[in-house]
């Protein structure tokens, strides 16, 4: 409950999350008990909503709360349930030194665990729940093991190396699921394609576009999945495809793909800086007819891809603005009485 509440309200304090988690657990224990009144949950959730709307509410603050509280009944409950904070950018959690960890753990193991779950889940709120559960579970196991070890620092170092894959999986999935949630599937696919174009500008649109679409499909399947191995399995398969398609083209990619661990290989690919821009002829803009055809979106994406591979140092944010602008222009002009005049004017 602490993890779920902290993911949902990533900017809330530990105390606010504690109040919310306590109320949710109490409601579940009362209403799921044998012989509980059938109206128990409805009455309990109504009381919880009323408490959320009170002036002295102990729950996480949200700018949308007042709007929800202006509604009544089921609409109010659904509105409050849908509220969530934006993800932390970048994640704020930093692991303290082993000595500090053990001191806090030995003082109060339960409080230590609860505070860690809150801080970690708040920082990586967009990582899939199974990934977060696995990562937090192994870390708490590490603390309980290493704090009774005769050599705690050596123990923490050894365990950190063993947890590296899971830590990277949490970092990667949080980053891409945040992007996916904020941008939507189409723009996230383009962002991924543009990043590939800048890392491997020698590769063509036909080579890189399927990789971007494959990544988008993987994240669309796994970001909200409760399957335990979804993200690791999909990311490993995607890494194999990327390595197979690009290793022969780029020595840097080949070096990243040389390892035995697909998740670490993928992180290496992710960390590659943009390559020098190749000497290429000027990119051809889509014609007005192409822009408004059934394949108009693909023509626009291809043109922006060509810009990205010719200008490998242009930041993702600017390419994203160009993508949004091209979409807006097509939406405005293609249904117009004279699309060509509209497009030329834009």
Regions found by a protein language model. Give the residues of each.
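General marker for long, soluble alpha-helical cores
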Residues: 1-346
